[in-house]
Amino acid sequence: MLSVFDAHVHLFDCEANTHAFLEHEDRSFKSIAGDYSTLPRRYLTEDYLNDSASYQVEGIVWYEFLSADPIREARWAQHLGVASHLRQSMVVLVDFLDPALEERLETYSTLPNVVAVREHLGWDTGNALRRFAKRPDLLTDQAWRKGLDALRRHGFKCGIELFAPQLSDLPDVTRLYPDIGFTLAVMGWPLDLSPSGYTQWRHDLKVLSGCENVCIEIAAIECLFGMGWRREEIAPWILSIIDMFGPTRSMFGSHMPIAGLSVGFERLYDAYQEIVAKFSAIERDHMFRDTAAAWFKPR
């Protein structure tokens, strides 16, 4: 049984926290996840372990899930993690332009499982439903970048979720803060899956891979390639990532329970295994477990 440290999981409970997009259909969320009407309103550790039972999960990276009160949600997740035998590292939500950023980081610092923060930076110039940032230019905004100074003081890593056309702005940021670890989510989120889109995505990722303080997460396959994705379709993209970042900076994640709207945990991880079957056992262990476990280790 393969040992796994899942690099991207959402655990939540609509009775404990408010997730508006789960109470009423949200067109923006639907634009990336498709029809999510069957997504559960409660998904806890035991639900995840049932879904992943065919694999030996040693730990997970819990990601905030668009709650109305991110601090309340983080405290709830901390309690959930403490009550479980499963190691749980946490990535929480911030706004780097928030005047109260320092206060929020102080609060997060009291939660031992919090190892990273993220802000939703995605801005699709061609689709107004996929504009999750305040503005399209945050990565180049000097005031926004100053928020990273506060992050550095607290020792948190920084999650980066954006769309592939924004990738070219990222290396300037990661080079400016070489002592902050940056995690690029959703494979750099390619929007254009055509041959020319692939070429541009690979070019921009290759530049970013030269920054040793960046790791990349391979997850949310269903959001990129659709609910009916095929292994043959996703393999070149995944293998390109590993070629550029190497096994020690590449990590697999499930994106459960959203992945459950597609093929589910077992078939997803089976596909991952088939795609990287030619790598050595040590290299596979890095991608499935060791990279995420080390990158998201407790502060």
Predicted regions and their residues:
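Conserved, mostly hydrophobic/aromatic
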Residues: 8, 60, 90, 117, ...
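Active-site gating/metal-coordination segments in enzymes
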Residues: 72-164, 217-221, 228
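Divalent metal-dependent hydrolysis catalytic cores, especially in the metallo-beta-lactamase
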Residues: 27-41, 47-68, 87-95, 115-122, ...
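Acidic-and-aromatic substrate-binding clefts and catalytic sites of carbohydrate-active enzymes
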Residues: 39, 66-72, 94-102, 162-168, ...
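A generic "structured core" feature
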Residues: 3-16, 133, 142-143, 147, ...
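Catalytic pocket-lining loop regions of alpha/beta-barrel enzymes
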Residues: 134-251
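Mid-to-C-terminal alpha-helical segments outside catalytic/metal-binding sites
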Residues: 2-7, 14-51, 59, 239-240, ...
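A general structural detector for well-ordered alpha-helical segments in enzyme core domains, enriched
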Residues: 47-51, 73-80, 101-108, 143-150, ...
